[in-house]
């Protein structure tokens, strides 16, 4: 039968659970924790059904792994939309059909998040050089930078974002020494056969953009909190403590940690 997350193990699920749903359990504004909730208990109950370690050996059948979504063996795919071009490979390559953007299971059924990527900046409210700091950060928000080739990931300037999205409706090309465009096709391998991936239609691009506009969560990540969860959940996974006992301990430890570090 089909699995929800494929070969995902417990630790990976806990990382996803906090990255996508961490705001359900920690209010980043007030510092109030909510780990002794029914939704968190439900997530630990599900995590218990997952394997502790990946049972696959080193000789993984690459085609078998790549085709798990096309063959309906795995239901959910962790789609990372850094730009619509890469998104096309994931949707038309891995999935091979129209998809639904459902997000990770969260309390408000809206478990998709915005991530700042590898580089992000914060301006200290106590800075003595706020204007200089702002001018430095501002350069990355200007139309010149947002439309430049330096920016590989998704632009935050809407006009630049829409222009970039439009590229996903066009066939890829490279430019020869005479400045002429040489077009080619994106391809994917399915069961040893090469298939052509057609560019997105305008309707498909519009649908993806509309989904992106609805995302209003940011990814949550705190290694200390995740370690607390993993450490204490082991007793539940090993049937040494009930899920209620474990979440009460997690709630206490997490709240102390948050209070001490605010």
Predicted regions located by residue number:
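Extracytoplasmic/periplasmic solute-binding protein
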Residues: 1-33, 72-76
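Bilobed periplasmic-binding protein-like "clamshell/Venus-flytrap" ligand-binding domains
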Residues: 1-9, 143-155, 256-262
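Glycine-centered hinge/linker elements that transmit conformational signals in sensory
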Residues: 29-62, 99-100, 104
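Non-transmembrane alpha-helical segments in soluble domains
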Residues: 41-51, 66, 124, 133-142, ...
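Extracytoplasmic/periplasmic substrate-recognition and gating elements
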Residues: 52, 91-169, 213
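Short helices/loops that flank or line small-molecule/ion binding pockets
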Residues: 62-77, 82, 89, 231, ...
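Long, aromatic- and glycine/proline-rich binding clefts that accommodate carbohydrate-like moieties
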Residues: 102, 151-235
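Conserved N-terminal structural module of periplasmic/extracytoplasmic solute-binding proteins
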Residues: 195, 217-219, 231, 240-262
């Amino acid at each position: 039968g089909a699995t929800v997350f494929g070969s995902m193990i417990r630790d990976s699920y806990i990382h996803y659970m906090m990255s996508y749903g961490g705001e359900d359990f920690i209010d980043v504004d007030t510092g109030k924790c909510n780990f002794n909730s029914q939704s968190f208990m439900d997530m630990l109950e599900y995590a218990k059904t997952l394997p502790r370690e990946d049972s696959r050996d080193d000789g993984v059948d690459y085609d078998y792994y790549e085709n798990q979504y096309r063959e309906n063996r795995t239901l959910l795919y962790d789609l990372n939309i850094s730009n619509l071009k890469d998104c096309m490979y994931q949707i038309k390559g891995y999935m091979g059909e129209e998809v639904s953007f459902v997000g990770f299971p969260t309390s408000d059924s809206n478990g998709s998040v915005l991530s700042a990527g590898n580089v992000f900046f914060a301006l200290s409210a106590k800075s003595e050089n706020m204007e200089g700091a702002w001018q430095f950060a501002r350069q990355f928000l200007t139309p010149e930078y947002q439309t430049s080739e330096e920016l590989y990931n998704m632009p935050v300037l809407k006009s630049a974002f829409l222009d970039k999205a439009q590229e996903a409706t066009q066939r890829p090309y490279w430019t020869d020494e005479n400045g002429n465009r040489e077009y080619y096709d994106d391809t994917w391998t399915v069961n040893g056969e090469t298939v052509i991936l057609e560019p997105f239609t305008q309707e498909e691009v519009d649908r993806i953009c509309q989904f992106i506009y609805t995302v209003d969560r940011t990814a949550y990540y705190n290694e200390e909190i995740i370690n607390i969860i993993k450490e204490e959940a082991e007793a539940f996974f090993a049937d040494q403590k009930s899920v209620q006992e474990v979440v009460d301990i997690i709630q206490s430890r997490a709240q102390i940690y948050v209070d001490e570090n605010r």
